[in-house]
């Protein structure tokens, strides 16, 4: 029987070459012998199986070739009816697999008539035809199984590809959503940071404006204090000048003309009255000075406390109004004191100037 080869491939890149090995039947009186030529195969690369349901012997084997190719075979042989199944045995020598199938009854071919031999040959031919039919049917089934297997494998690969595609799409969608969320979070964070920075800058500007206003208020209060001190100093200087003038008027002696032409000092009575008048004015001025000094001292203490509060940023609107009222009151008191002093001094000077003129007219020499 001539060998035939057929190439088959799989999805894994391995190619199989199928072939039909040469086989030969030998009928002997004691047993039926089947010889199969398996050149190139080793004993470990083949397998012999007896199928009880169909009373057939299946011989399979495969061996690797070069370039990811394999050589394989799958043959089925019908076991003769006059055979002891449990005594079938085989051997592999010189690349030939020999399967021996002992007979139940030993026949002697030499004594068989010619008709028996013809019947035996016909039976053998029929057995070979049956064997060929079974072999073709077995190959057809194997082919169908292989096609079904390939179809199943293809469907599985398509299913895996679809699952992989869906997973990739889901992963890409998830990454896009995650990226979008990260961008939104970053934008919100930047907006919050910007808003916080703007609030800090606005707060700093407000603090600077408040500090500038406090500085202006301190400067105004300082200028007001300096102006009040200058006015006080001016009034005190004017008062001291007026007092020195009055003292000169008081200490100036009066010239009295007598009959003898001598100059005499003023009378003690008139001097004592004038002195007492100026003493009253001095007391008024002194009282005004004491009140003014107390008011100035109080103002200085209050000014120090206010300045301390301004430095500590604790001054209130009521304290500001109080400072303004104190300044105005001080100015009024200073003006009143100056006016009183000036009035008394003027009256004293007019009275003293009128006294010498009257005395001189009365004491004019005859």
From Swiss-Prot:
Residues 346-366 have a biased composition (Low complexity). A- repeats lie at residues 129-133, 135-139, 156-160, 206-210, 211-215, 216-220. It comes from Arabidopsis thaliana (Mouse-ear cress). Residues 14-121 form the sHSP domain. Gene3D superfamilies: 2.60.40.790. It is found in: Cell membrane. One of its GO terms (biological process) is defense response. This is Inactive protein RESTRICTED TEV MOVEMENT 2. Coiled coil: none annotated. The keyword Membrane applies. Belongs to the small heat shock protein (HSP20) family. Seems to not be involved in heat resistance. Unable to mediate restriction of long-distance movement of the pathogenic tobacco etch virus (TEV) without causing a hypersensitive response or inducing systemic acquired resistance. The chain crosses the membrane at residues 322-342. Residues 345-366 are annotated as: Disordered. It holds the Pfam family HSP20. B- repeats lie at residues 163-176, 178-191, 193-205. Its main location: membrane. Residues 163-206 are annotated as: 3 X 14 AA repeats B of [IMA]-[RK]-K-L-Q-E-E-A-K-A-K-E-[EK]-[LA]. It is a single-pass membrane protein. The lineage of its organism: Eukaryota, Viridiplantae, Streptophyta, Embryophyta, Tracheophyta. InterPro entries: A-crystallin/Hsp20_dom, HSP20-like_chaperone. Residues 129-220 are annotated as: 6 X 5 AA repeats A of L-E-E-[SKR]-[ERK]. Keywords: Cell membrane, Membrane, Plant defense, Repeat, Transmembrane, Transmembrane helix. GO terms for cellular component: plasma membrane.
């Amino acid at each position: 029987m001539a060998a035939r080869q057929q190439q088959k491939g799989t999805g894994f890149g391995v190619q199989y070459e199928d072939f039909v090995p040469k086989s030969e039947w030998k009928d002997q009186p004691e047993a039926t012998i089947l010889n199969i030529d398996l050149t190139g195969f080793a004993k470990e690369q083949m397998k012999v199986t007896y199928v009880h349901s169909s009373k057939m012997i299946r011989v399979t084997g495969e061996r690797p070739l070069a370039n990811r190719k394999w050589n394989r075979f799958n043959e089925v042989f019908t076991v003769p009816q006059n055979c002891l199944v449990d005594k079938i045995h085989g051997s592999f020598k010189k690349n030939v697999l020999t399967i021996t199938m002992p007979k139940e009854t030993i026949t002697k071919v030499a004594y068989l008539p010619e008709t028996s031999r013809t019947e035996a040959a016909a039976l053998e031919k029929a057995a070979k035809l049956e064997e060929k039919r079974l072999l073709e049917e077995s190959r057809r089934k194997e082919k169908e199984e292989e096609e079904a297997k390939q179809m199943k494998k293809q469907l599985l690969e398509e299913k895996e590809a679809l699952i992989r595609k869906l997973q990739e799409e889901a992963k890409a969608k998830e990454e896009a959503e995650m990226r979008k969320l990260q961008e939104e979070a970053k934008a919100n964070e930047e907006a919050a940071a910007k808003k916080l920075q703007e609030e800090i800058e606005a707060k700093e500007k407000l603090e600077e404006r408040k500090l500038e206003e406090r500085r202006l208020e301190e400067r105004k209060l300082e200028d007001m204090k300096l102006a009040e001190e200058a006015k006080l100093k001016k009034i005190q200087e004017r008062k001291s000048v007026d007092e020195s003038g009055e003292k000169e008027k008081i200490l100036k002696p009066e010239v009295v003309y007598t009959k003898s032409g001598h100059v005499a000092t003023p009378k003690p009575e008139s001097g004592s009255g004038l002195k007492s008048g100026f003493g009253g004015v001095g007391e008024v001025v002194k009282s005004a000075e004491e009140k003014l000094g107390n008011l100035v001292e109080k103002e200085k203490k209050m000014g120090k406390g206010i300045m301390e509060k301004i430095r500590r940023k604790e001054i209130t609107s009521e304290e500001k109004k109080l400072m303004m009222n104190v300044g105005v009151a001080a100015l009024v008191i200073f003006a009143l004191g100056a006016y009183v002093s000036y009035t008394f001094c003027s009256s004293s000077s007019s009275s003293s100037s009128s006294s010498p003129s009257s005395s001189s007219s009365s004491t004019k020499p005859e």
